[in-house]
Amino acid sequence: MSMPLLKLAVVGCNSAAGLLETLSELKLPLAAFYPLDRDDEGELVSFGGDDWPVLELADFDWKTADVAIFLAHTDAIADALAAGCKVVDASGGEPQRGAVPVPPVTDVLLARLLGAFKAAGDVQFAVGTGLLAVSQEGQAGIDKLSEQTRAIFAQQAVEVGTTYAKRIAFNVVPVAQEKAAASATKLAKKLGVPLSLQLAHVPVFYGHSLSITARFGAPVTADALTTAFTDTGGIYLLPSGTASSQDAIGGDQVWVSNLAVSDDGLSASAWAVVDNSKLTALLTLAALQAALEAR
């Protein structure tokens, strides 16, 4: 992928949780790099083998950057756009006018799986349960799981904090149903498949997991299902055994295992895992290319 030399700003750099590391591995052609955040000025972040001091977002001159990746603080997007800076919105929030959005990993994961099911037969509806690694919440999620785990083993009081509604260490914390329902509604409309979705945070640093079941209007065979999943781009169907979130780390493929069809052929289920940080970085890179090409 060919790109010009970039003056790149990353907003919310302390929320990156592996994104900066993965982006640096892609060796973007950079003329300048500006890590930006609020209230973290002077802290250091690692990028491209070097440590960079975090700059205060409020004081930044947007005319010095060609393109900005927003991981947080999207209220500053308008200022960046007004200064002529291209913007990639990787915050996972509501789409911002003028910015190129990065789709949430859970949306991409579900889209690939439902695409495979639709290739196998007439999908009437689907039900899924997603288990989200703490890196979904950026560095704050990773730090909170680490802190709470240490406190438990040291028999100290565990501070819940604000990142999660309840303790995350050795626990499973459901995502607010309104948020999960909003994702399901948006995906159902896009893919034309009614979808019921539950999401939960789990005490895993990296790697999202998803259990999904689809109901068909007519019977499908195991062979048809296997062919559909094998032929769907972005999916690696494990020939045997079970895929864990750890197996997917380092790649952008959705690993699928435990593919099964009911006796009547009218329903099928699958287990899927993906490296959320790696896939987010690659999706961000694609959005970055789109932003640079946009006029």
Q: Locations of the language-model features?
A:
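Flexible, small-/acidic-enriched active-site or ligand-binding loops
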Residues: 276-282, 286-292
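Contiguous C-terminal substrate-recognition/catalytic subdomains in enzyme active sites
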Residues: 61, 159-249
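A generic structural signal for beta-strand entry/edge sites
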Residues: 209, 265-267
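A structural motif
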Residues: 128, 212-213, 284
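Short, well-ordered beta-strand elements
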Residues: 268-274
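N-terminal Rossmann-like NAD(P) cofactor-binding subdomain of oxidoreductases
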Residues: 2-166, 192-194, 218, 222, ...
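Hydrophobic side chains in beta-strands
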Residues: 130, 174, 214, 258-259, ...
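Glycine-rich phosphate/pyrophosphate-binding beta-alpha loops
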Residues: 201-203, 274-278
